[in-house]
Amino acid sequence: MPIVIEQSARGERAFDIYSRLLKERVIFLVGQVEDYMANLVIAQLLFLESENPDKDIHLYINSPGGLVTAGLAIYDTMQFIKPDVSTLCVGQAASMGALLLAGGAAGKRYCLPHSRIMIHQPLGGFQGQASDIDIHAREILAVRDRLNKILAHHTGQPIEKIQIDTDRDNFMGGDDAVSYGLIDKVLTHRTVTAA
């Protein structure tokens, strides 16, 4: 893990790179969305809210997706906390990663030029007694409907279009994701603020 040395009036302080970025209100969501990673992201969101509830949080996403329950825990926290959560796809935001990208604050959802975004219906499998398979089949259909409603809410697309478009893997580049309503803008360079 890279270490960053910061100079201050009190001397030097060493940070791992992610801790240093957290100090700037940047959270990285990288890799599979699973329970441990979700807990870390949620803890960082809550910590940054407690530090300053009025300042935006920046969530950088590079994820192939993962567990629906873990992803929805992150999503619910993003919606629950007071600060706006700006989302930025760097690399890919697929499946649950795409839902989290779309769940950023309106007007503050971005991707870089060569990012790849993919939406689809939830995946699942189960074996066991027929009655248990039936229970799990109904549950995955209910989860699919819940995820489609979230996407419809954040994209402005009709639920019927979301249902069709998520029936199979649906890949988009940045411009297509803007047109679809998953993000607000493709960023090609960082804006420079006047001194």
Curated annotation (Swiss-Prot):
SUPFAM superfamilies linked to this entry: ClpP/crotonase
| Any matching Pfam family | CLP_protease
Among the GO molecular function terms of this UniProt record, one is: ATPase binding
Q: What is its EC number?
A: 3.4.21.92
**Record keyword Transmembrane helix present:** no
BP terms from Gene Ontology? protein quality control for misfolded or incompletely synthesized proteins
Keywords (alphabetical) are: Cytoplasm, Hydrolase, Protease, Serine protease
According to its UniProt entry, the function of this protein is described as: Cleaves peptides in various proteins in a process that requires ATP hydrolysis. Has a chymotrypsin-like activity. Plays a major role in the degradation of misfolded proteins.
Q: Which family does it belong to?
A: Belongs to the peptidase S14 family.
This protein is called what? Answer: ATP-dependent Clp protease proteolytic subunit 2
Recorded source organism is Methylococcus capsulatus (strain ATCC 33009 / NCIMB 11132 / Bath)
